């Protein structure tokens, strides 16, 4: 009995642990990416190398482990995979990196917290989320969505005084990038468009998994298509600049390898697995943890300055985000209860006879929601 309880507890905690570990990995990617972007690495080339590494890592696992579960590739599934490779690896990541160039790693990560709100709206439009305004859990999700949008606007438009942290004292303002309002607005717009693209990716991934329920294979395909499509974009954007493709045994290679393995290969796979049970909104609901880690590390490594207005905006975003999480948690419990009720409501028929071919009567027992009724039926 004790073992069963432990197993159930671990089963319930697994999605939460997976998402927390994933956010720690994403925070490391943000720090490394900001470092190589500051050194002049092309974000378009970084995206290509990142997904090339992810494809090489995931392809053998997908080929071996998905042999029995991989469905037949159809034209519609391939179209969806091609679109998935465009939405997240190409559009979202390039816009996110560009937004980070104009601002800071902390700002870009904090702005990314509007992702669950955008995902929630799109999930509602595509019928993956239910909203009943008279129900408190739905109200919480709607209010939380509005709060995240308001917090993003505060972060973008309100700067406020500099917060003097003991490890950033004496750092001059010119050492911090992206502190003016124009850079903030430009970066916020780019990151927000990237968030919308990523939200579309999450919704389409959830839909694709219904007809192609092989997570490893889907991840490998997305990374491959992201590499091909990203290469086409990079060749156009870096035309006449072959030096942009140069890479050696340095932080560029480390960033591409780390991002490819942890933040593309593992992130797509883990996100797909958790999404099948918890939905796309749950998967995107842990981004504030990444923001906190990046904010602390950025002030130490890059000497980024913290502004009161942006901290307040981030707090509002987090508050709204956890309202969405609270509503999703209530949804999950409610749906689980309904499923149990439906299972217990199904009638069970038990036929008992005297063991002979020709019987005088049979007793049919109908059990429904704990109630038993016995009816004697005489047969000819």
Swiss-Prot record:
Main location: membrane
Topology within the bilayer: Multi-pass membrane protein
Keywords per UniProt: Membrane, Repeat, Transmembrane, Transmembrane helix
Pfam family name, one: EamA
Residues in the signal sequence: none
Species name: Arabidopsis thaliana (Mouse-ear cress)
GO molecular function: transmembrane transporter activity
Domain EamA: 27-134, 196-325
Subcellular location: Membrane
Transmembrane segments: 16-36, 45-65, 71-91, 107-127, 142-162, 187-207, 216-236, 254-274, 282-302, 306-326
Family note: Belongs to the drug/metabolite transporter (DMT) superfamily. Plant drug/metabolite exporter (P-DME) (TC 2.A.7.4) family.
GO cellular component, one term: membrane
Name of the featured protein: WAT1-related protein At2g37460
